[in-house]
Amino acid sequence: DGLAMKAVKMVFENLPSAYENGANDPKAREEMANASCMAGMAFANAFLGVNHSMAHKLGAFHHLPHGVANAVILTEVMRYNAAEVPTKMGTFSQYQYPHALARYAELGRFAGCTGNTDEEVFENFIAKLEDLKEKIGIKKTIKDYGIDEKYFLDTLDDMCEQAFNDQCTGANPRYPLMKEIKEIY
């Protein structure tokens, strides 16, 4: 967890300047390279989740760049994962329910978010992520990237099935149903 948490903190601290100033801020770019390396080491040992599975399909079907695809759906997936009682839970049988809300709140606190409850910290963390996305030009919705709505809807069932079967999905804190993946998209 330490590598992932430190990487998140470094992204918040450095991505806006690295994006806005590019080569004129080599320190921010260096810190982003380090954050990327740390994040890679973290997920190589812990795997990813349904956000990544869904992003794979947005890239494959609609040619969205992988980072953009991950970013545009991130907060919706976080809200899905943070639900108190999931529809289905079975991948990690040692847990009655996932503890995603508490874990997101822990990460939010580490990134500087405050609140009186985990729910408040989580909502502040979501707001901080949305602010970061806006600063670096991530659009609000998939549709905002110019994807034809009819084509998107025509491919949605295939995307959902493939995202459900993606190797990353099994590591998600909540094991999604295909209809839930569709609702997130």
Region spans (language model):
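Carboxylate- and glycine-rich phosphate/diphosphate-binding segment that chelates Mg2+/Mn2+
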Residues: 1-46
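Alpha-helix N-cap/helix-start motif at coil-to-helix transitions, marked by capping-box chemistry
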Residues: 1-9, 48, 68, 98-101, ...
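Short coil/turn segments at secondary-structure boundaries
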Residues: 1-3, 27, 120, 143-146, ...
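Short alpha-helical scaffolding segments that buttress acidic/His motifs in well-ordered protein cores
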Residues: 4-7, 32-40, 54, 74-78, ...
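Intrinsically disordered or highly flexible coil/loop and linker segments, enriched in small
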Residues: 20, 42-48, 87, 116, ...
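Glycine-rich phosphate/pyrophosphate-binding beta-alpha loops
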Residues: 37-70, 165-171
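Gly/Pro-rich interdomain helix-loop hinge
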Residues: 61-64, 68-151
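Short, amphipathic C-terminal "tail helix"
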Residues: 149-185
